[in-house]
Amino acid sequence: MSVYGKIPSTSFEHENTFELSGDLLDPEELKSLGVSGRIIYVLRHLPFKSSINEETREWDLSGRRGATTMYSSMNWLANSTYWQTTLVGWTGVIPTVSEKEENKDAVTRLDSQDVKRFEETYSQWNSGERSTEYVPVWLPGPEKGSETIINETRSQQSRWLAYAENVIRPLIHYKYWPSSEVDENEEQWWRDYVKMNHAFADKICEIYKPGDFIIVQDYSLFLVPQLIRNKIDDAVIGFYHHHPFPSSEIARCFPRRRAILRSVLGADFIGFEDYSYARHFISCCSRVLDLEIGHDWVNLNGNKVTVRAITVGIDVPRIIRSSGNVSVSEKLEELNKRYENMKVILGRDRLDELYGVPQKLRSFQRFLRTYPEWRKKVVLIQITISSAFKHPKLLSSIKKLVQAINQEFGTDDYTPVHHVEEQLEPADYFALLTRADALFINSIREGVSNLALEYVVCQRDRYGMVLLSEFTATSAMLHDVPLINPWDYNECAEIISNALSTPLERRKMIERESYKQVTTHTMQSWTSSLIRSLANKLAATKTDQRIPTLTPEHALSVYSKASKRLFMMDYDGTLTPIVRDPNAAVPSKKLLDNLATLAADPKNQVWIISGRDQQFLRNWMDDIKGLGLSAEHGSFVRKPHSTTWINLAELLDMSWKKEVRRIFQYYTDRTQGSSIEEKRCAMTWHYRKADPENGAFQALECEALLEELVCSKYDVEIMRGKANLEVRPSSINKGGIVKQILSSYPEDSLPSFIFCAGDDRTDEDMFRSLHKNTRINKETSFAVTIGSDKKLSIADWCIADPANVIDILADLANFTN
C-alpha cells in the first residue's frame, strides 16, 4: 500500500475558519486570534504629490491620481468600519519650486526640519475621527551623522522606480527587454530597487504592533514580504498583485527571478486579479524554484503559502454619487448637443505601448474603410494620458495616425477622431462615460480595468457596449461583452460595427449581466475577501503548533554532559541540499571532516541512514571507519568499525521488481527528463529533471497503477519523495534500522544524547521509532526535521537547512577535539 494511506488528510490540510466570501469580518470577531484591529497598507506612493518652496520652505500637497481601488479600500475601512488603517508609502519625487527662477531639475534639499513641517502639512489629510494614518518613506533617507534627508534632483529621485518600470513591468506584461539601456543599467537599478524595498520594510517594522495585518501591493515592492518576515517571523502578511503575471516561459527571463519569487513567498497569502495569473505564479515557483505546489498553494521550506485569485472591483456607491451630481449633468448636456445624432466611441489610456492605442486607431481606420455607411455617424474620442515615463515616439505615431484618419475621412463638419492629451476633470470624465455609446479597450496586456467597470455603472439603463481586449483580466469578469484581439484589425472593425448596431434587447441583457458582475465584485467585497484570507491563515497558524528550533547552544549543553551519544542522520536534504541532479549532491569537506571527528570519539556512535544505494555511500564515506552506514532505507547495513555490509532483505521476495520495472519504463518513455534508478532492494522513478507539472501528473498516474497492479499482489509499499516514487518491501524502512540500533544498547545503558535528523516523509519513520521507545529520556533526545518550523512533522525540533545542521555538527566536533 502507499504510505499516504497511513496519514489522515486532516494532518496536512486545514479547513477554513472563515468563508472566503461574505460580509467584512469585524476585528472583534478575530480578537481570540490576537488581531489588533489595524491593517497596514503598503503602497508605492502616498495618495498625494508634494513640492517644497525653496524660499519659504512651505509644502504644497495635491491629490495623486491612480491606485483608486487601494485608496478607496483603505478609506472605506477607516471611515465605515471598525478597522483602523495605516498607509506606508513613498513620498514620490519631490520637486523644489522657486519664486526666483524656474528650474525643472533643481536640486531638492531636505533636512529633518523640512520633514517635520511636511508631517504638519499632511496632517490636514487626516481630518475626521477615524481617518487613515499616513507614514511616509523617505528616499534615500538620512545619512549617518547627517540631518540631510534628500539632496538630489528630480531625475535622480526617480531612479527608485527604474527597475520596477523598466525591467519588471514590461516582463509581467509579456514584453521583453526593449533596449540596450536595460542591459547597461540593470545592476545599478537593482541595487536601488533593493534599497527602496529595505526602506519600506524598515518603516513597516518600526510601526508594527503584534496582531496587525500587513497588505503589501504590487511589483515595486516584491521584496518587502520576506524582508518583513526576516525581522518579524509571526507577522500576518498578504501580498496583492494588481497586474498580469506571465507564464513561466516569460517569468524565467527575470534576471533576478529567484530572489523575487522567494521574497514574495515571504507572505502568508498572495492574491491575483485572475485565476490564470495565480496559476502562472504557482507554476513559476515549481519550475524556477523547484518547490512543491498544489492547486492554490506553494510549499516553501514546509510553509504552505496560499495563492488565490480575488477579483478586484470598484467603489460602486462612490461612482454612482460622482456620476450623478449636477456638474456632470451640465457637462452631459453639452456633450449631447455637440454629438447630436452621432455614435460616440470612447477610449481612455495611459501613453504606453501596453494599452494598444495605435492598434485601436488602425482598427477604427479599418472600420471606417470597411463600413462606409458609418462615416459621419460615429466619432472616436481618444484620451491619452501621459505617464511618468515619457514615450515621445509612441505619442508621435499616435498623432500621425489621428491625422491620417482625419485627413482620409474628415470633412468640414466631421472629424472622426478627437484626440485629447490631458487628464480630464472628474465631471468631464463621468459625463463622457455616461454619453459614450461604446467603450473601446484595446490593451495588449492588462489586469482589471477600472475604466470598464466604471463605464458599466455609468451606463445603467443606457445600454452602452464595452468592446474589451481578450488580454485583460476584466474579460474573465464581464463574460457577455464582445471580446477583441487587438492585432486583428478586420475582426475589430466587424465587432465595432456589430456593437453599434446591436438590438436593444441584446444590449439590455449584456448590461444586466455586466452590472450584476460589477456590483457583486466590488472594492468592498475584494477588501473583505483579502481580510478573510489573512484571518484564515492566522487561524491555521494558531491551530498548528510551531516546531521549536534546535540551537547549537542547547545541543552542545546536552552533548557535553553525555557519556554515550548517538547520531542517526538522513543524507539528502539533511546533510546536503536537494539538487536537480542527485549525483551532484556530494558531501562537502567540512561535513566529512566533522563526521570523521565525531565518529572517532569512543563516546559516540554515528550513523548515516539514507535512501542512497551502497555504492554511493561507499564512494564518499567508506574511509570513515567509525561511521555506521545504512543504504536503501535500511535494506543494507554496515556497522561502525566494520567493512562488511549486511543484506537485511536477503530473504525477501524480489519478484515484484520485474512488474515495477515495466511500469516505470512506460512512464519514463512518456515523461521527458525522467529516469529509473534500480537498487538491490528498491526501485525509484525520478522526475526531478522533467517538466515539474507533467512530472507530478505522471507520478500520480504511475502511483495509481502501482497500487492496482503491484501493491495488491506483493508485500511492498510506495514512497513518494521529492520528485521521485520509490517501491520497496513493506518490512524495510528507516524506522526499523533506528529500532535495531537502539535495541543494541543494554537496558540500563542507553545514550544520554540522541540526535536523529531527516527532512522528508521517509524520515518520519525514524522519529516514530524514537518516540515509541519508552526507555529514552525525552529531554536528551532530539528528533529533528530539517526545514520550516511550520512544517507538518512529528519531530520535536527543527533546523532550518543542511548548512545549519553541519554548523551544529561542527560545534559538537569542536567540543570533542
Swiss-Prot record:
* UniProt-annotated stretches for the region Glycosyltransferase: 1-547
Pfam families in UniProt: Glyco_transf_20, Trehalose_PPase
This protein's record includes keyword Hydrolase: yes
What top-level branch of life does the organism fall under? Eukaryota
Q: What happens when the gene is disrupted?
A: Increases cellular trehalose-6-phosphate level during thermal stress.
Might you give the EC number(s) for this enzyme? 3.1.3.12
The Swiss-Prot or TrEMBL record describes its family as follows: In the N-terminal section; belongs to the glycosyltransferase 20 family. In the C-terminal section; belongs to the trehalose phosphatase family.
* Name under which the protein is recorded: Trehalose-phosphatase
Q: Which organism is it from?
A: Schizosaccharomyces pombe (strain 972 / ATCC 24843)
**Primary gene name:** tpp1
